[in-house]
Amino acid sequence: MSESESDYFTDGSEDDFVPTSKKSTKKNASSKSKQPLGDATNSTVSSSRSSTPKPTNASETYQKLSQLEHILKRPDTYIGSVEKTKTEMWCFDAETESMVFKEVTIVPGLYKIFDEILVNAADNKIRDPSMKNIRVKIDAENNIIEVMNDGKGIPIEMHTKENMYIPELIFGNLLTSSNYDDDQKKVTGGRNGFGAKLCNIFSTQFEVETADLNMGKLYKQSWTNNMSNVSKPKITTLRTKKEYTKITFRPDLSKFDMDCLDNDLLSVLRRRVYDLCGTVKNCNIYLNDKRLNISSFKGYVEMYVKAIKERSPEPEPQDGTIKNFTTIVHEVFNDRWEVAFAVSDGSFNQVSFVNSIATTSGGTHVKYVSDQIINKLVETLSKKEKGKKKLMIKPQEVRDNMFLFINCLIENPAFTSQTKEQLTTKVSQFGGKDKFVANDNLINRILKTSIVDKIRAIANANEDKALQKADGSRKSRIKGQVNLVDANKAGTKDGHNCTLILTEGLSAMNLAVAGLSVVGRDYYGCFPLRGKLLNVREASADQISKNAEINSLKQIIGLQHKKVYTAENIKSLRYGHIMIMTDQDQDGSHIKGLIINFLETSFPGLLDIPGFLLEFITPIVKVTVKARGAGGKRVIPFYTMPEFEHWRDTEGKQCRWTQKYYKGLGTSTPMEAREYFTALDRHLKRFHALQGEDKDYIDLAFSKKKADERKEWLQGFLPGTHLDPEITEIPISDFINKEFILFSMSDNVRSIPSVLDGFKPGQRKVLYGCFKKKLRSEIKVAQLAGYVSENTGYHHGEQSLVQTIIGLAQNFVGSNNINVLKPNGSFGSRAAGGKDFSAARYIFTELSEITRKIFNPLDDPLYTYVQDDEQTVEPEWYLPVLPMILVNGAEGIGTGWSTNIPSYNPKDLVTNIRRLMNGEELQEMTPWYKGWGGDLEPMGPQKFKVSGRIEQIDSNTVEITEIPVKTWTNNVKEFLLSGFGNEKTQPWIKDMEEHHTTSIRFVVKLTDAEMQKSLRIGLLERFKLVSSLSLANMVAFDPMGRIKKYNDVLEIIKDFYYVRLEYYQKRKDYMTDNLQNQLLMLSEQARFIKMIIEKQLSVANKKKKQLVALLEEHNFTKFSKDGKPIKSSEELLTGDDADEEEETQEQEGDEDVGNTSVANIQEGEPEQAAHVPETIYSSYDYLLGMAIWSLTYERFMRIMQQRDQKEAELNALLSKSAKDLWNQDLDEFLAEFDKFLLRDEQERESLASNGKKKSTKRRAKATATKDQPNNKKVKVEPKEKKSTSAKPIVKKEASNEPQASSSSKPKEKDDILSFFSSSSSSAKKTTKPSGRATSNKEIETITLFSDDDDDEDIFNLNSSSSTKVKKEAKSRSATPAAEKSKKSKSSGKQSILDELEDLEILGNFDKPEPKERRTRETASTTKRNTKKKPVIIDSDDEDEDEEDDIVMSDGDDDDDFIVDE
């Protein structure tokens, strides 16, 4: 033995060693083979088979080995393979002093015994944190390895049970360990009691040296011959104050079939020493007396990253394409977890340590960390890169680009084997308070590395691969597309000349197919889209690849994913053009936009080809003009509403026409489709090739990442924006900004109210329907929903409309401050926030009395009404007398925008409006909710604290008497019930009682301790009776129709104020014009009558043209049908055109009278209103159409009197300003609002006093009463003027208030607008004789000249001869043809001249004798579909006789006249 060897070991004399056992000594003495352990054993077995006979009994077959024998016999179970193995692994290159990843040939078992000693040294740092050094010496030449640490030494004392020193017990006896107590949680590497003993067993010499400072002793002992021989321990006095433990061993190379420690093994052993630099904190590591310069785990990791960079075949780009390729993301999470991340070179790498053990095969700890990082990376990238869609990438593909470094401490770790290469401990058993969590900080730092580019590249490649599966090609035939009508030339060499028509559904496809009969099937194909195309910009590749519509389009057109198309290679497609054929509405625009988005995103270049994308337009309106003469009818199509409106206001005034709206393609007939395709150039429009900012606008419209920019884009939208219908080539940016934006706005329009009336369109439609129906008596909500849906063009389902109606009628606390509809039934309560309403078929509603005080009917003619198909529906907005958006508040969520506006006290609003009128500064207002008794406290400029009410009523009882507004009773109850506790929580409420009526009252009992706790916390806070109210999101459509965010409530008031004031001026101007027109008309009628009476004007025996010329000669003013003076005769039909129009009207009058039988009316075909032009004759209808009873002196005087009255009204109106009119409305509103509040308070007090809600009274049927006996006719005496009309049969409800009725209440105002107004040129008044059952029709009269009294006269006149009327009515109803024969010779239009001739009293006005008696009652039994109604001219003088009442004819037939015998 060399001198160097004597430094490590004893002299080897026989006195120094004793055999550990006889059996092992003999065994080892006889086996001196230099073969590897495995080979030696196998050769022994094989030789025994050849030379030794087989055992003859079972005892010889079955053997028992000692533990030591078993380890030597089967080493792979304990230390791994003892054969040389080629493997790729990280090593330390001593020459370059760097890590390298290379293929080496090592014996894993030899590496493992060295590792066991290193782990023991590292474990001692856990036991003794004061340890400072670990020194490793590897003498390859002499085959000697030494590991020393200066931590606490091994106790040098005798083991009481085993009767040997503890160092000998630990290193020389198997299955000895300090780690067997599983109740004690340790984070060391030792586990099974083998460890260093394995190193001893596989060494020819093994020595331990340890210093125990406590005992003051130094202990030395050695083993030889594979731990078979052990020397006696040498114990001496410790001469230093330093403790240490040193292990020196000589590996038994023969057991590993090795002659020496080769370079491959040495490089792995050196790397393992470097591992300690990263895993053992605050400890100096020495290798062969050289201190290693790595002092942290991050520094250790950098060695690997540097090696990765050197291995990379491509240099790191300098242009930023791949960011921070060699960046290390390192983070220490706690004292047990330290993780570093780097980007790998395409395969997953990990270097991990569990309690300083190198887990080269990973394990549960590596999976635990990597899974978290991968999931968070994919999730975050999905949000950042592609919106909310999931990236098409597998976790393993992400893992392949990761290099993870993990240094962790696991309590009592478990491994797959004694080699400890792979951890198997469950995550739940890792121990420690805090485990590793991939937090946002770590993920965000990882996202700054090049892994983002790698993941994106992999995901894109996967997506492309998936999408390419559905690629099309130029085939002559496509299989599996049942709905495809393929062009005959598609897929051939002429395919690029073919056009594919994409239609909106199958119904539109029928229209296209009908058109193909004109252009042929060779170059035109057709395919229907089912619904709306997928937004591919935000969709995942998985969604796109599974979308049937997109796959069909790719196959039909022949599109290939990501192929860049040009004008040259477009011939590779089956179709060279796409024509979009959708409805001309917002949904149609959306479909066009989605197709553009699909092509721009998936097939770059297609939109750069001029003429590739086309659209087919159809008319929105068709006008049928009745041409005169032999020309017949003429049809004029209009493709935009502005175009139609211009024609209507110009050329349309000169002719008779009807209009038909084409809402969708399905409205057109196959014949019309052929007409469209015949004039294909007129109906085709091209989309301009991409230019300028087109791509940016497409991205703006469809990308979720552009949400903020889209919000600003929508905010800049101006109502009335539309594409120019004259352009033949549509720029895509214009399409997005002027057509597609209408669809984008539609959701906001439905969800966000107007600042002017506070309504959304659905609410506005309901109110319009109620006004149109004159809803003064209750109706079922279900019926009202049906009526509104039918009459206002509502297209979203009646159930949604039902909820809107219920919302307008709800009046519980927190709902509406003013409910414009009455809640007659269960409309929901505060308990559930109104969601607990009854079914619509069980509840009733009607207009509240206050509603028309808010929405004055005098404003109705001033609104701009929406056109929906042939219907005129609700106005664009109403103008209430005060801003209802602040009265009832508003909530809604739209696209990119939402709103939340609180409610305010109407009286405060009125005060501020009047302050604005007076030029005073506005006062700040506090939100107010009717009936709510809580507290509101400011918490800043735009926030309020909302508090309920709670009081302590005894030592352990509290009473809740109010809850925060918008917090519902059931929510509070649920919270209180949770206070009773459950299996997981302790109770803190003893008992709870409810005593609610219309108010809130909870009585809650607590324990003494909980009461004290509640008082410390605060009763409001403990019982969650505090919320907040924000003013920071008050969004509404401003008066210009643009979305606007209001900064404060006063800004809303100002926006409302100026528009409302402007419309009061418009109301005054409108009323002034009407009064002036009425004055002029009355004056002209009086002059006409006077000239007839004084025989200055003769109308007898003159033709129409002569009469008109005569009137023009006397400068009589011409009036239109709506009562407005006609300034120029150029606006009228004259000459032959006028004669032909008059003849047409007379003929239609005859047809109408002859076709009034119910049997002749065709069901399902509503009469279409035709526009009838004004003629020179109709302009004098107000004179020549007067009934002959008007030509009396009494009537002349009455008209003069009425003229004076109207003049007085006009002067009174002119004396008032717009503000005066507004103040008058506000006074009336406040008076009604006080009544409204009083009724509400009385109802609540009544319900509270009864302790429960009263049952709803049943709606009484109209039954006979004392004043109105059943089944009896009521005869009204002619001279009595108790009412202006017969009492109608009405349903009555019990009420403390007198019921208003048209028959009993006097007019509150002069009906100024009832005279020839444009919106209602004549107002209908319906009167009905009393009695429950009557066969008489309702008598319809048209109010003119404030004729309340004369209506009564006419009714009395009819009533006085009711018997004759009924008989005549019955006969006319039974025999309409016979009655027609009794008509005068001019049944179409009766002039004064004709009437005088019929009555044979021409020139005699003193004693008129009618030719036959006709009554209004008789005339009403026969339906006449005429446009003009008879007009009653009467006087307001109550002392006039009814004989003076005269009915002015409309000139349509004789039935208009009412005379007395």
From Swiss-Prot:
Pfam family, one: DNA_topoisoIV
UniProt xrefs under InterPro entries: DNA_Topoisomerase_II, HATPase_C_sf, Ribosomal_Su5_D2-typ_SF, Ribsml_uS5_D2-typ_fold_subgr, Topo_IIA, Topo_IIA-like_dom_sf, Topo_IIA_A/C_ab, Topo_IIA_A_a_sf
Extent of Basic and acidic residues compositional bias: 1274-1283, 1406-1417
Domain Topo IIA-type catalytic: from-to ranges: 752-1226
Annotated site residues (Important for DNA bending) in this chain: 893
The record's free-text note on cofactor binding: Binds two Mg(2+) per subunit. The magnesium ions form salt bridges with both the protein and the DNA. Can also accept other divalent metal cations, such as Mn(2+) or Ca(2+).
Region (Interaction with DNA): 382-389, 1024-1033
Positions bearing the site annotation: Interaction with DNA: 532, 535, 710-711, 760, 794, 800, 968
Enzyme Commission number: 5.6.2.2
Binding positions for Mg(2+) 2 per the UniProt entry: 583, 585
EC class of the enzyme, as a word: isomerase
UniProt GO cellular component terms: DNA replication termination region; synaptonemal complex
Molecular function per GO: ATP binding; DNA binding; DNA topoisomerase type II (double strand cut, ATP-hydrolyzing) activity; identical protein binding; metal ion binding
Keyword field: ATP-binding, DNA-binding, Isomerase, Magnesium, Metal-binding, Nucleotide-binding, Nucleus, Phosphoprotein, Topoisomerase
Binding-site residues for ATP, renumbered to this chain: 120, 149, 177-179, 190-197, 418-420
Chemical reaction(s) catalysed: ATP-dependent breakage, passage and rejoining of double-stranded DNA
Active site, UniProt feature: 842 (o-(5'-phospho-dna)-tyrosine intermediate)
Compartment(s) of residence: Nucleus
UniProt-annotated binding residues for Mg(2+) 1: 504, 583
GO biological process, alphabetically ordered: chromatin remodeling at centromere; DNA strand elongation involved in DNA replication; DNA topological change; regulation of mitotic recombination; replication fork progression beyond termination site; resolution of meiotic recombination intermediates; rRNA transcription; sister chromatid segregation
Further details from the record: Eukaryotic topoisomerase I and II can relax both negative and positive supercoils, whereas prokaryotic enzymes relax only negative supercoils.
Stored PANTHER family: DNA TOPOISOMERASE 2, DNA TOPOISOMERASE/GYRASE
Subunit structure: Homodimer.
Function, as annotated: Control of topological states of DNA by transient breakage and subsequent rejoining of DNA strands. Topoisomerase II makes double-strand breaks.
Entry protein name: DNA topoisomerase 2
Originating organism: Candida albicans
Gene designation per UniProt: TOP2
